[in-house]
Design a protein with these regions (language model features):
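Charged/polar, solvent-exposed surface patches and flexible loops
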Residues: 20, 59, 148-151, 155, ...
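Broad hydrophobic/π-residue packing in well-ordered secondary structure
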Residues: 20-21, 100-102, 146, 189, ...
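Rossmann-like dinucleotide-binding domain that binds NAD(P)(H)
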Residues: 3-104, 111-114, 170-174
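C-terminal helix-rich "cap/oligomerization" subdomain common to oxidoreductases
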Residues: 80, 155-210
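Short, low-complexity, polar/charged sequence segments that are solvent-exposed and flexible
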Residues: 17-21, 54-57, 116-117, 126-129, ...
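Glycine-rich loops and low-complexity Gly/Arg-rich segments
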Residues: 24-26, 59-63, 122-124, 132-134, ...
């Protein structure tokens, strides 16, 4: 996944967006085995070494409506990754490297300065090409996040069941907290036995809609 914003709060939103996609994998969510947060030039080095996928980053960036740099200046299209502009635009890159208990690996790249939206890409078993999407956000000034939240509260009170798994909130908070401990502990890889959280996401889509 990719995101921007440069704060713990924005990182949480990007992590949750990624989690709401990968929790739907076959077998459901199984929990997190380890995390590591790396920053700066080590992020690009990790990509070169294959610790995260350049191809998936390219697919995620292809969904962005807010590429900065030359596109922002004069509207031209550009390949942020292939041209090397991405590395010039992002002064303080951060990578959340997450390993799940079932073997899945996921990476959130916070690339503030390159894009201003949230995007996702993944490799599906048996498929040659990645699949990708952008998470559309409510535009300003009519930001309707609270209205969406209230609608889900109303749905829960009406049906007597939470419309989305509370475990998602718990696991995302745990990932963020553990990654911050990694950051302040020398960017070391940390095992996360406390994040052995298993659950299944609902089959229905819970995307915001008017």
């Amino acid at each position: 996944g990719t995101g921007g914003g440069g704060s713990d709060a924005m990182d949480y939103h990007a992590l949750e967006a990624m989690q709401c996609m990968i929790e739907r994998r076959r077998g459901g969510e199984t929990g997190v085995a380890s995390v590591q947060l790396i920053e700066g030039k080590k992020v690009w080095k990790a990509g070169d070494e294959g610790r995260w996928s350049m191809r998936l980053l390219e697919a995620a960036l292809s969904r962005s409506d807010s590429p900065q740099g030359l596109t922002h200046e004069d509207g031209r299209t550009q390949d942020l990754l292939g041209s090397g502009e991405l590395m010039k635009l992002v002064e303080k890159p951060a990578a959340y490297l997450i390993e799940f208990r079932d073997g899945l690996r996921a990476t959130l790249l916070m690339i503030n300065g390159a894009v201003a939206d949230y995007n996702f890409a993944c490799k599906l078993k048996g498929k040659a090409d990645p699949v990708s999407c952008q998470f559309f956000l409510s535009p300003t000034p009519n930001v309707t996040y609270s209205a969406c939240l209230v609608a889900k509260i109303d749905e829960m009170l009406t049906t007597g069941a939470a419309p989305f798994p509370a475990e998602r909130t718990m696991i995302v908070n745990g990932i963020l907290e553990s990654c911050l401990r990694s950051k302040h502990g020398g960017h070391k890889k940390l095992k996360t036995p406390h994040l052995e959280v298993a659950y299944r996401a609902p089959r229905e889509s819970h995307h915001a809609r008017s």
